[in-house]
Amino acid sequence: DLEKKGWQTILANNTVNETTPDFSKVTTASEKGLYKADDDYTATTGMKSYYFRGAVDNNWVKFGKDSTGKDIYWRIIRINGDGSIRMIYTGTTAPKESTKVVMTGEGTQIGKSAFNSNNNRSEYVGYMYTVGQQYGTSTSSTIKIAIDNWYKKTTLWTNLEIKALVADEIYCNDRSVINSAWSSTGSDFDYASLTRMSLNGKPSPSLKCTNTSDKFTVDSSNGNGALTYPVGLISVDEVAMAGGKLATSNSSYYLYTGQDYWISSPTTYSTTTKYAYEFLVYNVGIIGYNKDSNVNGLNGIRPVINLSSDVILSGDGTYSNVYTVS
């Protein structure tokens, strides 16, 4: 009997909800589970993406060590539609009974940074950007430089055995615009990710990234090939699917940390303030999109990586038996 793949282990340890959640409501403290949706791989692989939502306590992974030799702990965001496993940095402190659902504090991030230290053009919403272009990738953002500098000193990069377990997957930095025209500085407009989050209507988060130019990858076979290291940030769609919402606080879902931290999705450009804005998970667990989310604000960094579809997971993802990877 062939050993189960990691993604199969996760599916075996959870019951998949066949319904689609109501994204117009935040999750409650008693609401938790694994749900499914199409992503960028589904059309090719025939496999759904399976995402954790709400007050889950069995999505813990211990994987890799940071530059000081400390074990790194992650929370699984979702199984991607190719069987790889997407997860977000949660620090170097092992979870315990009291932190099994929600772990708070600055330790859940690698530090703080501006998204971009420049903020007076809409291009600066880019994880990478080119001045004068909506979808450019010639210059790394401030936050990308910080993430890359952290990543290359971890065993995720320095240890070849561990490096081989990390997959090159899509990080979506969706710079498309739906309801108006894009401009560098000439007009006010909302990005498509803000339109999808719909303040007054029903949010419609999507795990499909609209443009190849915004699918940040190392290799160009399934994305833009602009990255050096296979690491990025969580998208606002992923945060919404996990239980977050615009303008509604939520301190019971697994992405809540009591900190303000960056999301990879842009929101608006304002000619009044002359600022570009990016989404944040605010310290009350809200999906935030104004005032503090100006791209040169100083906010937390929680890197996201993906485990290969071939990894084996031991454990069951709970605080007392976190998944380990081989």
Please report, for each region that a protein language model flagged, where it lies by residue.
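Long, domain-scale functional regions
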Residues: 1-326
